[in-house]
């Protein structure tokens, strides 16, 4: 069975390998299919046509003027856009003319109608882009084809193709019909209302300016768009008229739409998108807006001031008048938290004069965002104001920008992360932390660093950012951030102590990002620091920084302190002083990312269950400010009525509108890491259904600001996929920009005049997850987000493709910085309002004015980011990279018309043409856009839900990159385009009504345009056929030259470091790729066939696997013949390896084929380049005289039709241009020769391709043979399987025999339960080993019993002996005491008394009346005994006067020899001590010493006897000789007569001579102790004397035991009767002896004998 299982496992592995092979085939098939599609889209040489006369006229005129600015400017807008013709309807002019274009051109650029651009019906839209001229058609490839190529190479891996010039041309008849049809429906140039700006001088630094009259746009009743009106469109005038991006105040450039226009889009005029910012614009030092040669895919110039794209009083859906509900901006007169009306502190984005709510007019107190180009230097640039007209950045350097970031403004991330913010704030300005002075604020944060921060070091940065952190909002790390953050540290304190924070937190402002998210801010303000602005003076910062308190928890580390507190607000609870539960503004333990204590994961602002009375305004319904039990990464408790998440009365720059019912500022159950937690997954910043008017602008219906249940990665989540940033159904102007450090809602690098379009529905300002880090909202087509003719330098962030960001056809000089490659900024021919940015997740740039409540792309919906229940039918194309009309990375040089017929669709060109008049937002997929799903945005008909009906259109989606197949499921929602996985085709489907409307309206307009064009060309060709033909050729040559020059520029930029030959080879290789032979398609079919065969083989293998698994289950008890099966499977392994090898060879062959194909035309390319270079000079000279030749040719025809006033007085004389005819003829001949060379080259290439085809066929044959071999192996496997089945039958028989044996065993086997029971009761050997045998135990017990009995007997005998001896000792002691205390004491006292009496008689005291006041000797007083009335001689009471220094005795000399006479030494030592302690003269001392010595001698003998007795009987406490010596020494020292002087016996000698020999003679060498040094203290302190008196000491009793006693009383020393008897007892005198060791007591004295013992000793000595 084990072998069988192994074989089955191997079979599964084999199936997996087959699956992998199948995937490889499928991938190869997709790639080949992609190549096939591209080949099918490559037009043939026969498609090259001539240009129309009308286009030729305009082209020559524009070309003449453009040539004056230099040949380089010819490439201004067609750069990287393929070989667009200079004069063809599809070719964009090399440079935009400064002359007013004809009305046909203006309308063509706005209409978007091409000859064949109406797939399934197209008649233009109802928007200004009802038709786009053929010139605009070529602008599409020029703006997108090249711009998308870099991304194509980087992301999609699709080869970058440059379309040939033939790709740009359409048939001549189609051009005529298209133009005639269009122009017939529009007013002529001379019929335009309003003044017309005539030819304006064009500055050389403005080659890309787009001419536009002041009335090029007007409103038509039958169209919901912008059309030529009397409106003064200063943004459409040549750039030379005004400084770049500067709109004259006299002109109503507040917005492109004129007043009373109900539209939300701008007219896509002819604009060269590839150089939105002219290369030579004065002041082009964009301060880092974009580095030269940097691929700033969507960087938009900032200098222009887009007020909001509407005029005051206009009901612009995206810009409402004053007092209206400016959903996303402000309402006049309200405390706009971030966006305020004019006349007040414009912290936000508002117009001062017109309540443009977020867009401000110049000359007002624009604290927020003021027009960079309209704000004079003298004005108070308190906002993002440009001090001069020439604004290289927001503010001119050196200008005093007091309020670039207005104090207290909601500057969350004034500079967006990763964006190249040239000068969000100008250097040199007093930016208090915004910028570094004198520095090029290339990003206003350090380039290359994730400096979502605001400023550079070197300024008084007020600590704007955290160094080294993810500065989503403020400054460069490691710099001198004096205030906001300590530079180079993990922000222990948000503000450095002692630093002057002039404006870190302006009073009354809401510094959302005062503390950087994720930063370590132990305290928003460090206590003791000079927090001038952290808590602004005059602001009631009760909670921001408690006065005198350590605000270490005001902003806890790891928390997102977007704005700890709002200055000017009574922050009673932000860090509530005197509130215990506000220790960190939020108690730790809760998930408070906002204002919490350090160490706790404070994802939310407060701890769940804590009533944060002050975090929101006290008195408000702050249930808990954070819902308990949830991960409150946000500020408020979901479901709570947050009338003031922040204080209602405070200037909450948009955090929460005061008085607004913030029931769910944070969606319940969502991950609220912070109100706007950067880098976090804000599933729902706001609770669904809550009226979040304050979270974004007041007055905005922010029902949830985030869709409930949607993955709201963050209200302003940087770098996250913010697809559903806002709640469906709510007018979410786009609170923030996702995809970057959106600490604030201000678009980095630009004056966010329209960051939130008033009343517009830009669903998130920037769709979450979109590449556009810029201001453009992916979900809405912000036509007027960047006004035409202005310099919104930062409107589009780098790396972002904003197709509809700028108005096509409008002059956005700075919309894109020079060198920036806007991959999706180009406008398309048709309705540009529906154009979408190219980068991913620009899903459906719907016009801002559309009522797009929650409309999001289907992909967003699939990811849970779209509003549930919202009809998002056509908000976005159904696939990932729906940012623009074309998928990034594809070759989109120009959309190819479906066919001439409006209702037909070319089978090989699955793309959409321009929509009808009612389809304002239709997007046009190009056939070359493999991998792009497109949807027609029928804003009012079939595309917008709720307008006219459902309608969708999506195209083939091949190579959709970045798309999760699991998320590309067909949507079952009504109106949502079905999403397909990569490699699948999405069918085109629309509602019949929408198609009919498109057909009817499109054909109507198209016929007019075409008829007018045909008439114009017919008139000219009839009169001047040669000239017409010549100019046709000239236009084509110009197109070829321009394309080739553009391609060479591309090569110079992209192939830097290579030789010219390599560059040319690369260019020609791409050109050759367009002519891949059709045989490759057959090869692709063959590969598909092989793939199908692989599928069939896979099915067979799966059947075999099922058979094996089924039989394996039946063979549970069988043994398989593993050897044979392994052999068969080994053969399969070898086969699989061979197949893989063949596949590898196939890949290599394909790579070789590609390389050969690229190198096939290298020789021809050199010659072609040489010829084109020769043509260059001819074309330049031809252009100089082209206008003259034209006027000469046309003069005879127009003489009778032109009025006298209409004749050009400056017309050139015909004779002046005669010399040009020869050159023209030479040019024609050269052109014919060049055409012949191209044809010959085309003929020669198929032969080489045939060879490559044969090689590919051989490779395919090998693959097929390999597959056949696999089939053979499968047959072998079938045979093996049959063998296995036979074996199975045999094993089945064996199993039957086994069953019989089992039955027999069942009868004869032992009972298992019985065995288990026996085993259980069986003794355990290991347990027995630990037990003791009974015999051993008994023997040990008996032995112990015997030993105990012996011990008892011994103890009893000893106890009897001890008792006898004790009794004897007691008897003897009693007897001795009687003898000692009676007779000897009596006799001694009697003798003493007699002696004293005798002395008194012999020497009575003499008293003199007037003697000295003091005497040396103590006086004696006469006293009588109370009992016997005997006279007594006692010394006078009082302190004894010491006569010698008191101090411890010096150590005695000790010999190494043992003592022999112990008692003698004891007496000597103490007698010496006694001699110094007496107050009597030396003679008296001698007598006293003799008496005392006798007593001590007897006492010592008694002690020795006691010691011997105790040693013999083993008393409890043995009195050893050492103890006895110490006791004797202590007794002597403790005697009262010796208290006067300490022991000085070591160096004192007796005056009485002593005899030699006797008991006092030493038997060992004795040396007197000489005082080697003085004692340390001669006089003992009074404390020591008192302690000596009252210390409790041990007393040695006569019984040998030691008792407790005190040393208070001592018997007086006994003196002899007279000094004469001293000699009789010399033997009793003490002798010096060796000093003994110190005593054991703490004070140096051991316990003394009791009085009775001392007296007894004295008596004994007398005896």
From Swiss-Prot:
Comp. bias intervals (Basic residues): 1623-1636
Keywords: Cell projection, Cilium, Coiled coil, Cytoplasm, Disease variant, Flagellum, Membrane, Nucleus
Listed Basic and acidic residues bias regions: 171-182, 958-975, 1609-1619
Primary subcellular site in the record, as a coarse category: nucleus
InterPro entries, sorted: DUF4795
Location of the protein in the cell: Nucleus membrane; Nucleus; Cytoplasm; Cell projection, Cilium, Flagellum
Compositionally skewed regions (Low complexity) per UniProt: 206-217
GO cellular component: cytoplasm; nuclear membrane; sperm flagellum
Tissue and organ expression note: Expressed in the sperm.
Residue span of region Disordered: 80-239, 423-481, 575-615, 880-925, 948-984, 1609-1663
Stretches assigned to coiled coil: 1085-1160, 1286-1325
GO process terms (BP): cell projection assembly; flagellated sperm motility; negative regulation of ubiquitin-dependent protein catabolic process
Ranges annotated as biased composition (Polar residues): 84-103, 131-150, 1639-1663
Disease: Spermatogenic failure 35: An autosomal recessive infertility disorder caused by spermatogenesis defects that result in multiple abnormalities of sperm flagellum and severely impaired spermatozoa motility.
Subunit structure: Interacts with AKAP3, ODF2 and TSSK4. Interacts with AKAP4.
PANTHER family in the cross-refs: GLUTAMINE-RICH PROTEIN 2 (PTHR46766:SF1)
Entry function: Has an essential role in the formation of sperm flagella and flagellar structure maintainance. It acts as a suppressor of ubiquitination and degradation of proteins involved in flagellar development and motility.
Protein name per the record: Glutamine-rich protein 2
Organism from which the protein derives: Homo sapiens (Human)
Organism phylogeny: Eukaryota, Metazoa, Chordata, Craniata, Vertebrata
Gene: QRICH2
């Amino acid at each position: 069975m084990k072998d069988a299982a192994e074989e089955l496992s191997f079979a599964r592995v084999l199936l997996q390998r087959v699956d992998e092979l199948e995937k490889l085939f499928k991938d190869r098939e997709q790639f080949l299919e992609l190549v096939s599609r591209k080949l099918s889209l490559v037009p043939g040489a026969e498609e090259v046509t001539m240009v129309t006369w009308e286009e030729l006229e305009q082209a020559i005129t524009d070309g003449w003027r453009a040539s004056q600015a230099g040949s380089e400017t010819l490439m201004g807008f067609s750069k990287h856009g393929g070989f667009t013709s200079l004069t063809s309807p599809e070719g964009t002019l090399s440079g935009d003319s400064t002359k007013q274009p004809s009305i046909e051109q203006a309308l063509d650029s706005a209409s978007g109608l091409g000859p064949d651009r109406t797939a399934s019906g197209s008649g233009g839209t109802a928007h200004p882009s009802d038709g786009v001229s053929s010139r605009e058609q070529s602008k599409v490839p020029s703006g997108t084809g090249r711009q998308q190529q870099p991304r194509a190479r980087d992301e999609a891996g699709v080869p970058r193709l440059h379309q040939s010039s033939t790709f740009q041309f359409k048939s001549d008849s189609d051009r005529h019909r298209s133009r005639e049809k269009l122009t017939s429906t529009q007013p002529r140039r001379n019929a335009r209302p309003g003044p017309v700006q005539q030819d304006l001088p064009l500055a050389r630094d403005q080659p890309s300016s787009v001419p536009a009259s002041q009335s090029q746009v007007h409103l038509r009743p039958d169209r919901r768009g912008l059309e030529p009106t009397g409106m003064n469109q200063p943004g459409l005038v040549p750039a030379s008229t005004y400084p770049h991006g500067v709109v004259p105040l006299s002109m109503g450039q507040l917005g492109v739409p004129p007043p009373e226009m109900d539209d939300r889009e701008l007219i896509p005029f002819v604009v060269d998108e590839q150089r939105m910012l002219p290369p030579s614009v004065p002041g082009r030092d964009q301060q880092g807006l974009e580095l030269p040669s940097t691929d700033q895919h969507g960087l938009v110039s900032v200098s222009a001031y887009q007020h909001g794209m509407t005029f005051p009083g206009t009901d612009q859906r995206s810009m409402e008048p004053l007092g209206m509900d400016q959903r996303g901006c402000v309402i006049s007169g309200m405390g706009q938290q971030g966006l305020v009306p004019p006349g007040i502190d414009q912290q936000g984005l508002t117009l001062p004069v017109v309540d443009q709510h977020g867009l401000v007019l110049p000359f007002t107190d624009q604290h927020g965002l003021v027009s960079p180009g309209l704000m004079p230097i003298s004005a108070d640039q308190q906002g993002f104001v440009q001090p001069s007209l020439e604004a290289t950045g927001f503010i001119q350097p050196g200008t005093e920008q007091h309020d670039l970031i207005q104090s207290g403004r909601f500057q969350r991330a004034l500079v967006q992360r990763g964006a190249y913010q040239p000068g969000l704030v100008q250097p040199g300005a007093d930016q208090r932390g915004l910028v570094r002075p004198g520095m090029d604020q290339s990003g206003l944060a350090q380039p290359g660093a994730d400096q979502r921060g605001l400023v550079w070091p070197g300024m008084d940065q007020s600590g704007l950012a955290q160094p080294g952190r993810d500065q989503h909002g403020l400054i460069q790390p490691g710099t001198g951030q004096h205030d906001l953050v300590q530079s180079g540290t993990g922000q222990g304190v948000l503000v450095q102590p002692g630093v002057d924070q002039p404006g870190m937190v302006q009073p009354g402002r809401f510094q959302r990002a005062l503390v950087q998210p994720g930063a370590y801010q132990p305290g928003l303000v460090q206590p003791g620091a000079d927090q001038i602005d952290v808590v602004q003076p005059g602001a009631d910062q009760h909670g921001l920084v408690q006065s005198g308190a350590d605000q270490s928890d005001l902003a806890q580390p790891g928390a997102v302190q977007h704005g700890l507190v709002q200055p000017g607000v009574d922050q009673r609870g932000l860090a509530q002083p005197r509130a215990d539960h506000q220790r960190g503004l939020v108690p730790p333990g809760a998930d408070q990312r906002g204002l919490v204590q350090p160490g706790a994961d404070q994802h939310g602002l407060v701890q769940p269950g804590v009533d944060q009375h002050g975090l929101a305004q006290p008195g408000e319904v702050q249930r808990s400010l954070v819902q308990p039990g949830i991960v409150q990464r946000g500020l408020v408790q979901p479901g709570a009525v947050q009338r003031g998440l922040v204080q209602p009365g405070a200037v909450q720059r948009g955090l929460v509108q005061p008085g607004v019912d913030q029931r769910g500022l944070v969606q319940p159950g969502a991950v609220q890491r912070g109100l706007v937690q950067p880098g976090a997954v804000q599933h729902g910043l706001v609770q669904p259904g809550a009226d979040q008017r304050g979270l974004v602008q007041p007055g905005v219906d922010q029902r949830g600001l985030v869709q409930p249940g949607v993955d709201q990665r963050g209200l302003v989540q940087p770098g996250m996929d913010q697809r559903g940033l806002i709640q469906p159904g709510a007018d979410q102007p786009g609170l923030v920009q996702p995809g970057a450090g959106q600490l604030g809602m201000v678009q980095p690098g630009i004056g966010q005049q329209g960051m939130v379009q008033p009343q517009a529905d830009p669903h998130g300002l920037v769709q979450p997850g979109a590449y556009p880090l810029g201001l453009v909202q992916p979900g809405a087509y912000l036509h007027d987000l960047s006004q035409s003719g202005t310099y919104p330098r930062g409107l589009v962030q780098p790396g972002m493709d904003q197709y509809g960001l700028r108005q096509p056809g409008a002059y956005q000089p700075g919309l894109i910085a020079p060198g920036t490659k806007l991959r999706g900024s180009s406008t398309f021919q048709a309705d540009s309002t529906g154009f979408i940015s190219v980068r991913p997740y620009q899903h459906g740039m719907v016009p801002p004015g559309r009522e797009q409540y929650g409309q999001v792309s289907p992909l967003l919906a699939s990811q849970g980011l779209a509003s549930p229940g919202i009809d998002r039918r056509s908000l976005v194309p159904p696939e990932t990279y729906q940012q623009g009309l074309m998928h990034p990375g594809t070759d989109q040089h120009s959309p190819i018309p479906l066919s001439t017929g409006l209702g037909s669709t070319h089978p090989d060109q699955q793309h959409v043409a321009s929509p009808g008049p009612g389809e304002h937002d239709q997007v046009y997929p190009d056939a070359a856009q493999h991998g792009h799903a497109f949807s027609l945005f029928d804003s009012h008909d079939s595309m917008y839900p709720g307008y006219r009906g459902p309608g969708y259109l999506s195209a083939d989606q091949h190579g959709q990159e970045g798309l999760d197949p699991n998320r590309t499921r067909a949507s079952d929602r009504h109106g949502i385009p079905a999403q397909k996985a990569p490699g699948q085709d999405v069918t085109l489907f629309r509602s019949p009504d929408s198609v009919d409307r498109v057909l009817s309206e499109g054909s109507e307009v198209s016929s007019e345009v075409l008829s007018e064009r045909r008439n114009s060309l017919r008139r000219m060709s009839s009169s001047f056929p040669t000239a017409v033909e010549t100019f046709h050729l000239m236009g084509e040559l110009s197109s070829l030259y321009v394309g080739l020059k553009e391609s060479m520029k591309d090569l110079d930029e992209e192939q830097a470091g290579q030789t010219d030959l390599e560059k040319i080879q690369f260019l020609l290789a791409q050109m050759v790729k367009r002519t891949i032979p059709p045989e490759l398609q057959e090869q692709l079919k063959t590969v598909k066939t092989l793939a199908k065969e692989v599928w069939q083989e896979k099915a067979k293998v799966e059947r075999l696997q099922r058979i094996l698994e089924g039989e394996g289950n039946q063979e549970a008890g069988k043994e398989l013949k593993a050897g044979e099966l392994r052999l068969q499977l080994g053969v399969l392994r070898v086969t699989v390896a061979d197949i893989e090898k063949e596949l590898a060879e196939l890949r290599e062959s394909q790579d070789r084929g590609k390389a050969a194909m690229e190198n096939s035309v290298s020789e021809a390319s050199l010659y072609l380049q040489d010829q084109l270079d020769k043509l260059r000079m001819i074309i330049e000279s031809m252009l100089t005289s082209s206008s003259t030749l034209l006027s000469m040719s046309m003069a005879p025809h127009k003489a009778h039709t032109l009025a006298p006033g209409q004749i050009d007085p400056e017309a050139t004389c015909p004779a002046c241009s005669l010399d040009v005819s020869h050159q023209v003829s030479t040019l024609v001949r050269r052109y014919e020769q060049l055409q012949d060379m191209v044809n010959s080259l085309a003929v020669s290439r198929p032969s080489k391709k045939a060879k490559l085809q044969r090689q590919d066929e051989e490779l395919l044959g090998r693959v097929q043979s390999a597959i056949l071999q696999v089939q053979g192996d499968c047959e072998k496997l079938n045979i093996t399987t049959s063998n296995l089945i036979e074996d199975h039958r045999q094993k089945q028989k064996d199993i039957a025999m086994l069953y019989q044996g089992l039955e027999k065993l069942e009868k004869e086997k032992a009972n298992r339960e019985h065995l288990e029971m026996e085993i259980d009761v069986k003794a355990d050997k290991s347990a027995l080993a630990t037990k003791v045998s009974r015999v051993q135990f008994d023997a040990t017990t008996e032995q112990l019993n015997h030993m105990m009995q012996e011990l008892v007997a011994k103890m009893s005998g000893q106890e009897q002996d001890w008792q006898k001896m004790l009794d004897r000792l007691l008897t003897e002691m009693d007897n001795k005491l009687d003898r000692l205390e009676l007779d000897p004491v009596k006799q001694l006292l009697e003798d003493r008394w007699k002696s004293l009496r005798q002395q008194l008689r012999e020497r009575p005291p003499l008293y003199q009346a007037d003697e000295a006041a003091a005497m040396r000797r103590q006086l004696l007083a006469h006293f009588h005994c109370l009992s016997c009335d005997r006279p007594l001689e006692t010394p006078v009471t009082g302190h004894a006067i010491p006569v010698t220094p008191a101090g411890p005795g010096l150590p005695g000399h000790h010999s190494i020899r043992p003592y022999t006479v112990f008692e003698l030494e004891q007496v000597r030592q103490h007698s010496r001590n006694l001699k110094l302690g007496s107050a009597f003269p030396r003679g008296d001392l001698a007598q006293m010493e003799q008496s005392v010595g006798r007593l001590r001698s007897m006492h010592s003998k008694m002690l020795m006897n006691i010691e011997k007795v105790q040693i013999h009987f083993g008393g409890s406490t043995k009195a050893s000789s050492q103890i006895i010596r110490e006791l004797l020494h202590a007794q002597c020292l403790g005697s009262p007569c010796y208290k006067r002087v300490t022991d000085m016996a070591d160096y004192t000698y007796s005056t009485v001579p002593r005899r030699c020999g006797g008991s006092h003679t030493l038997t060992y060498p004795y040396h007197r102790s000489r005082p080697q040094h003085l004692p340390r203290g001669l006089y003992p302190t009074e404390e020591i004397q008192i302690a000596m008196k009252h210390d409790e000491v041990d007393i040695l009793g006569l019984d040998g035991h030691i008792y407790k006693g005190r040393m208070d009383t001592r018997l007086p020393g006994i003196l002899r009767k007279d000094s004469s008897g001293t000699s009789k007892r010399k033997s009793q005198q003490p002798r010096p002896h060796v000093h003994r060791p110190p005593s054991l007591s703490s004070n140096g004295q051991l316990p003394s004998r009791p009085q009775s013992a001392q007296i007894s000793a004295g008596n004994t000595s007398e005896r």
